[in-house]
Curated annotation (Swiss-Prot):
Zinc-finger among keywords: no
Organism of derivation: Canis lupus familiaris
Topological domain ranges for the Extracellular compartment: 76-81, 161-164, 215-240, 308-346, 416-432, 486-492
Keyword entries, A-Z: Endosome, Glycoprotein, Ion transport, Iron, Iron transport, Lysosome, Membrane, Transmembrane, Transmembrane helix, Transport
Reaction equations catalysed: Zn(2+)(in) + H(+)(out) = Zn(2+)(out) + H(+)(in); Fe(2+)(in) + H(+)(out) = Fe(2+)(out) + H(+)(in); Mn(2+)(in) + H(+)(out) = Mn(2+)(out) + H(+)(in)
Region (Disordered): 1-30
Glycan attachment residues as annotated in the record: N321, N335
Full protein name: Natural resistance-associated macrophage protein 1
Amino acid sequence: MTGDKDPQSVSRPNYGSISHPPSSEPQQEPLRTTYLSEKIPIPDTEPGTFSLRKLWAFTGPGFLMSIAFLDPGNIESDLQAGAVAGFKLLWVLLWATVLGLLCQRLAARLGVVTGKDLGEICHLYYPKVPRTLLWLTIELAIVGSDMQEVIGTAIAFSLLSAGRIPLWGGVLITIVDTFFFLFLDNYGLRKLEAFFGILITIMALTFGYEYVVARPAQVALLQGLLLPSCPGCGRPELLQAVGIVGAIIMPHNIYLHSALVKSREIDRSRRPDIREANMYFLIEASIALSVSFFINLFVVAVFGQAFYQQTNEAAFNVCANSSLHDYAKIFPRNNLTVEVDIYQGGVMLGCVFGPAALYIWAVGLLAAGQSSTMTGTYAGQFVMEGFLRLRWSRFARVLLTRSCAILPTVLVVVFRDLKDLSGLNDLLNVLQSLLLPFAVLPILTFTSMPALMQEFANGRLSKAITSFIMALVCAINLYFVVIYLPSLPHPAYFILVALLAIVYLGLTTYLVWTCFIAHGVTLLAHSSHQHFLYGLPDVEEKGKISG
């Protein structure tokens, strides 16, 4: 095993050269027709000094990225964590957010240093078959995330209309509102980023209101936040802890963030400018994810205070004796612990704290669904253009993604019930966790390559932390598989699972192999994969590499 600074990696021409910005294609018109069509200029300030003006110029991509930490899937995971474990899992939420920040830091750094997003670099470095499989997994993650947004938005419309808008009607409304929000592109990048900021503010105010009225016990809350323990916890709490990690770190978000940072004008021929951009993007991402953490904390704390170990019978009685007594029927009359979801959670808030709490909850849920819709659209566009070099209009792209998301959701709503819809939301959180290696492994691979990143390649500490994240994710996924296999309804499903597992493990093994090569394990470097050690020669940079 050799060190990271192989001398050949310095002397050979490479894709990530800072003095000569790379280009994977001959000079063409830009592929982007949205977001990246406009570049935000960075003001000149005195070198070596911190500038709020400059921080403001860099502010935007991190907050758009943070919306994936606040989508309806996260909200459902939060409220279930509170209802199942009280405040005991707040420390898991905290450290999952920190791990998410570390992954997003790598994504931003890759985009700043190379001038290309993760999808584009995957297109350059991976052969056709693994590249195509990798693209399909990320598209699956995007569709899964979009399904969660459809579910959350539909439930929000149902709550706001007091049930007058059926769930299937709310699902269909999401088709229209998505295209409406896409028109925001026409009003400029900063206005679009400001709109996302407004949606995040709405979530902070609405869920913060619930936190204030619930008045959680602050001492117990701080203990749950700062002490990494879970006294008296069993399998349900462990499953919920795993669900928190799966909901927080989203695979498509890593691809998204690496593209969003390209919206700022950065002189990549100057190392100080790159170093400065990395610093400001890290500060902005830290602020954005701090805001998202507190919003998630509000939700966990509210349900941990009001609904921890609550029984269905108690929930029924509370609602039956409130002004929202018509909703009491959604809780079965038994002594089992209530299994809350984003619909029942809103109803319970209204029953306990008054109707205003229900409607405010629904507004926050609507903001979460709508903001996630837009970022999911951008992620899909960046991933498709990066991997396939295929240019689609944003309308065609969102129509494809939303159609794939709406069809299964409508089928569940029409032929099953609300409980199955919420169960689908939980299953989608599991899916995001299973697909996470297909984002973390590539970002760890490419940000660890000195030939690509030069002096900005990962150091030993960064490699160790990211490798720990990868090992944690793999352990979580293995645990999920062991837990869910016995619940398969028919032996024939085992054949399907086995076939999918072969593809999954094969692609994961390939990505791990190339990751080791990028870390300097030269013994594994086949002649066809030398570019993971030394970068791409000029002929490959010009798009002439085959496969």
